[in-house]
């Protein structure tokens, strides 16, 4: 499926400007979405793209000039390099040093994190914290699953959610922990948001339908895995064997990413006692049903 074409710089609403990270790829889609949020002379920047992408720094400078604003603070949705990687370059090339707050949720279990070469410490937030700037109020939503430190942000003025990588504008997300991820999707569904500003891909206008689609998709994948194992109950399968059955319509270059997700489904099903794992000598899986 061809991806939507996104401009590098676009005003999405009265208080949200998207600056594309200029880092397209199989996992980043059109690139990381970074967002300037607010209406005043100082605004919040959500996410920062990857390190050493001068095109992004140029686009961000253009946005700051065009909207006659500067960066009040930075909030990053999670620790992945395509979201935190640009912080040091922004500090060096735009802000003349990190004399402002860079905030995120702590890793779980906690580990000390330093921001690139600038050795700036993060300001750690918690679920429910409120961050304000002129024209915008953001509420922190702890949404682990994609990563252990993942946050979404509710934009109160628009009944919208900045979803980070919990929900994408196109395709589906990868995750570290499926159990946590499903809980986070349910949490976002309960928000009854109208709109999603995702970490990658275009804006989602039917927020609740998209979140429900993600939940249904994961449940359907789980059923496909169980069906493949039950139809061959005398056999055991490697995770890649199952990818080739369950993700048969997915391009082969995405099979490794698909295997990552499928393995988490297998771990969840094992916890529930529905399947078992054996070593022979590689890890193989069989149905218990």
UniProtKB/Swiss-Prot annotation:
GO MF terms here are: RNA endonuclease activity; single-stranded RNA binding; zinc ion binding
CDD domains, per the entry: LACTB2-like_MBL-fold
Binding positions for Zn(2+) 2?
82-83, 119, 165, 200
Residues holding Zn(2+) 1: 78, 80, 119, 146, 165
Q: Where in the cell is it found?
A: Mitochondrion matrix
Protein EC: 3.1.27.-
What is the main EC category here? Answer: hydrolase
- The entry's keywords: Endonuclease, Hydrolase, Metal-binding, Mitochondrion, Nuclease, RNA-binding, Zinc
What note does UniProt attach to the cofactor annotation?
Answer: Binds 2 Zn(2+) ions per subunit.
Q: Which GO terms describe its cellular component?
A: mitochondrial matrix
Q: Which cofactor does it need?
A: Zn(2+)
Task: Tell me the superkingdom of the source.
Answer: Eukaryota
Chain's role: Endoribonuclease; cleaves preferentially 3' to purine-pyrimidine dinucleotide motifs in single-stranded RNA. The cleavage product contains a free 3' -OH group. Has no activity with double-stranded RNA or DNA. Required for normal mitochondrial function and cell viability.
Q: Which family does it belong to?
A: Belongs to the metallo-beta-lactamase superfamily. Glyoxalase II family.
What name goes with this protein?
Endoribonuclease LACTB2
Organism equals Xenopus tropicalis
Recorded name of the encoding gene: lactb2
């Amino acid at each position: 499926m061809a991806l939507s074409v996104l401009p590098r710089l676009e005003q999405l609403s009265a208080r949200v400007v998207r600056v594309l990270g200029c880092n397209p790829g199989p996992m980043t889609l059109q690139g990381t979405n970074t967002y300037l949020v607010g209406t005043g002379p100082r605004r919040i920047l959500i996410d920062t793209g990857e390190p050493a992408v001068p095109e992004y720094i140029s686009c961000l400078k253009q946005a700051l000039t065009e909207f006659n604003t500067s960066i009040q603070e930075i909030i990053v949705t999670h620790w992945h390099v395509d979201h935190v990687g640009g912080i040091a370059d922004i500090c060096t090339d735009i802000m003349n040093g990190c004399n402002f707050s860079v905030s995120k949720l702590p890793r779980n279990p906690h580990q000390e994190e330093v921001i690139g070469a600038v050795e700036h410490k993060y300001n750690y937030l918690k679920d429910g914290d409120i961050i304000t700037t002129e024209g915008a109020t953001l509420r922190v939503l702890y949404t682990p699953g994609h990563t252990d430190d993942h946050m979404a942000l509710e934009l109160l003025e628009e009944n919208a959610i900045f979803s980070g990588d919990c929900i994408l504008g196109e395709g589906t997300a990868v995750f570290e922990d499926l159990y946590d991820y499903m809980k986070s999707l349910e949490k976002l569904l309960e928000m009854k948001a109208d709109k999603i500003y995702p970490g990658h891909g275009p804006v989602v206008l039917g927020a609740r339908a998209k979140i429900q689609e993600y939940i249904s998709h994961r449940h359907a994948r789980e059923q496909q895995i169980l069906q493949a194992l039950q139809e061959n109950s005398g056999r055991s399968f490697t995770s890649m064997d199952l990818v080739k059955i369950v993700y048969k319509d997915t391009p082969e270059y995405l099979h490794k990413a698909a295997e990552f997700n499928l393995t988490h489904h297998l771990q969840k099903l094992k916890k529930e006692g529905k399947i078992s794992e054996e070593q022979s000598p590689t890890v193989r899986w069989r149905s218990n049903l």
